[in-house]
């Protein structure tokens, strides 16, 4: 009887052991939905409530001249001070046409989205033979089919195009080109030129340049 009992106990133990080993380890999920056992998992941003500020659909961006100045400053100790900086938000087409779904010819445009687009000059520069003193300015435009009027305005720290035209500082007329490679997002960058740098403004298939000359 004792031998039979031992065999039964051994059989039950073996069954239990095999049952435990056959169970797959379940992934550990924390309260936030992140799989701790999967390093490639991520939390979908739209599922995370943000009590402080939501992510804007038109991201804010910054362009320097020299290009990538903050990186140069951190890697090259002898990097001189920047000449200028542009801060703007980048709207995108989302299946719409630039003209006339988003913009209208002859109507002012903030050259971005949300806060007014701002350009900062760290030293005096020249634009179309006009001296622009160092300082902060709002940058906006009035687009036409063949040319854009670019305006510098001193009414800084404002939203959208609530611009006080009495504070317009300078106006510049620059030609535009069409049928360029199409860009989904508004893009504004500085590009080196013979006498300084051009501010390139490009969106959809439209592109224009504002030539900026440096004063030695």
Regions found by a protein language model. Give the residues of each.
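Surface-exposed, gly/pro-biased binding rims or lids
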Residues: 157-198
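Bacterial N-terminal signal peptides that target proteins for export
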Residues: 1-9
């Amino acid at each position: 009887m004792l031998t039979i009992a031992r065999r039964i106990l051994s059989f039950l133990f073996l069954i239990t052991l095999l049952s435990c080993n056959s169970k797959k380890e379940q992934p550990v999920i924390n309260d936030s939905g992140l799989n701790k056992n999967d390093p490639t998992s991520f939390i979908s941003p739209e599922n995370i409530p943000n009590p402080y500020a939501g992510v804007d659909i038109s991201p804010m961006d910054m362009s320097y001249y020299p290009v990538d100045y903050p990186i140069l400053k951190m890697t090259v100790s002898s990097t001189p001070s920047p000449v200028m900086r542009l801060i703007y938000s980048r709207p995108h087409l989302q299946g719409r046409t630039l003209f006339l779904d988003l913009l209208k010819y002859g109507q002012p445009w903030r050259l971005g989205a949300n806060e007014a687009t701002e350009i900062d000059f760290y030293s005096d520069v020249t634009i179309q033979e006009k001296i622009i003193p160092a300082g902060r300015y709002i940058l906006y435009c009035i687009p036409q089919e063949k040319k854009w009027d670019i305006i510098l305005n001193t009414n800084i720290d404002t939203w959208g195009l609530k611009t006080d035209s009495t504070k317009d500082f300078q106006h510049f007329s620059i030609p535009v080109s069409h049928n360029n490679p199409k860009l989904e997002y508004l893009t504004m960058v500085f590009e080196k030129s013979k006498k300084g740098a051009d501010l390139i403004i490009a969106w959809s298939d439209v592109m224009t340049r504002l030539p900026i000359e440096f004063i030695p």
